[in-house]
Amino acid sequence: MRRIVLVILSLLVLDCPSGRSSPPASPEPYGRVDPIVQRIVAAISEERIAENLRTLERFETRHTLSDPTHPTRGIGAARTWIFEQFRRYSPRLQVSFDTYYVKKQGQRLVRDVELRNVVAVLPGTRQPERRIIICAHYDSLAIVRGPDGQVDWTQTEVFAPGVNDNGSGTAAVLELARVLSQYEFEKTLVFIAFAGEEQGLVGSTLYAQKARREGQIIEAVLNNDIIGSDVAGDGASANRVVWVFSEDPADSPSRQLARYVKRIGELYVPSMRVEMIFRHDRFGRGGDHTPFNHEGYAAVRLTTPNENFAHQHSATDTFANASPSYTALVTRINAAVAASLALAPKPPVVTTERGMPLIGRGRSGYAAHLRWRNESPEPDLAGYVVVMRATTAPDWEREIFVGLMNEYVLEGVSIDAVTFGVKAVDREGHESLVSAYVIPPRPRATFETSEPPQREGY
């Protein structure tokens, strides 16, 4: 093994690199715009997104339990149209229904139902086993209340256009499939329109659980849910901001993906600000990213900060109250992130085979000694980047390109006061997700006790 030693005089190096170091590889082959990804982002069409939104509205309802046999109305007509759109985009897209038979249960599944997710797979060329999922739910809901004010969940055929929730996400996934399917990527891209979200994340839960059982390697899940409005019910507007929700804790796979979305999204769509929200979702709400997080995959939700709650789950969630221009901006962020990940090398492994972090205090006992593994490095791998931040900082604060090393030592830096990670970069500057060094949870201890021994004379 080779080693680079960087002497850091104080932790202020996170903000001011005044320490003495061995020179890293130069120039740094990352942090720049790829012309191919730039073309992909530019190809996203607001007009096509608007056309998709109008078509989805014309189905009148996409309720999961609506009539699946009607040719122009309801969930069946909608999923057939989505299926055919995927097929039209490219012969390289492998399009299928992911079908489940779900029993009547709970409040919202008022009868047995055949549930169909619509899936389009664009196989990767070099690492086809590694998957990037771009998804949204295509079902809709309009709530009807009875005379007593309680929700009548049996009303499955009422007008429920669902343009913002979630025709907007569905239109984005369709447009992303159209554009990205014209290119080749090292990893596999999977475009999914989920059903049953409004009944409790049913379609995504069943898909994520199946993926885990099958041992699928899902590197990232970008869930788009409610990305179609840029004016809130109180008149507030932030049409150049998108929220990205991610799962705790601070260095979870989900949180690393959120940081990646911010970094790459703002690089390729500089007119937008990606605002990371460190919660799994909004209060009282849920999304199709959550089942993937439950299965240990990195998943995030992209959503508008400007939702009009008066239109939520109602007959007024129409195209007239939507903003295709805002949806297009969020779709471009998706395009940049998905393409960059699909072209990037795989993340390095920073744990042992038993899951222990490959981090220590070095020979001095007062250093940060980082190690990582890559069993099969890509032929175009340029090297690795060590990233670090204060434990209280929301995002990475310093990066050091170390080249084709598999360990790195920072003298005088406490591993207890700084969070570290490593990412891989290729010669074209494509960056992997960061693999963070995480302290494994300390197991809860239990101790047996007994009654005090009896002593004579007491």
What are these regions (language model features)?
Residues 398-405:
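Short beta-strand segments within Ig-like beta-sandwich modules, predominantly Fibronectin type-III
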Residues 366-380:
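Conserved aromatic anchor
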Residues 410-431:
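Beta-strand-rich modules
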Residues 427-458:
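Extracellular fibronectin type III
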Residues 194-291, 295-301:
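Metal-dependent peptidase/peptidase-like ectodomains
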Residues 25, 48-123, 273-275:
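A non-catalytic alpha/beta surface segment that caps or lines the substrate-entry region
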Residues 307-354:
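His/Asp/Glu-rich mid-to-C-terminal helical/loop segments that flank catalytic regions of hydrolases
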Residues 120, 134-135, 139-140, 145-200, ...:
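Alpha-helical metal-binding/catalytic segments enriched in His/Glu/Asp
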